[in-house]
């Protein structure tokens, strides 16, 4: 897809991978609707518009979608389901509220956003949905059972829906990033983000690579990891 002039929705746009993705999309000529609970600091661009949205609530997603079409036009070409969070802890001491918060954001929010854009993408017979899963969607991790469960769900959802919509000219790509230097690790005891991790810009670059593939070329899954993940010295 030639991204020049195309409309892209990016969830979780305020920081990390979402913010980096919005910036790279803008550099490629896209019009970006940034959805998030807070506006990204320092992102000023005539092709960027922020829409306040908490993806945990379907009515908020529906309102953000309506507002996006009203402001940017009916056609929606790209959805990057990036909004997500991780909370660590052993299952037998885990907060039920935290469990629900992760599923409401990482799984239910992704479903609400995907459901919102699909009718328009089907009318266009053109679209690309990118779901940000995690290495945690491919293997279990001690004290991260809840987060892994959400990302396994994203993986299953992505691999199923791509088969549903491929004949409508809609691509679905699922990314499985390893450790990336973002605020994600702020809430993970014993793990600190460091420069040996991948950078948000690296993941954003991979997203744009998948988006810019020729029409009949479809990248379904992308796993990515840092080459030298341990902090040196």
Language model features: what each stretch is:
Residues 7, 14-15:
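Conserved glycine-rich cofactor-binding loop
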Residues 134:
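Residue(s) in the substrate-gating loop at a strand-loop-helix junction
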Residues 53-63, 96:
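The beta1-alpha1 cofactor-binding region of Rossmann-like NAD(H)/NADP(H)-dependent oxidoreductases
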Residues 28-43:
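Conserved glycine-rich Rossmann-like NAD(P)H-binding loop of the short-chain dehydrogenase/reductase
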Residues 90-91, 98-100:
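Substrate-binding pocket helix/loop in short-chain dehydrogenase/reductase
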Residues 168-170, 174-175, 190-230:
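C-terminal helical subdomain
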Residues 114, 150:
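Active-site helix of classical SDR
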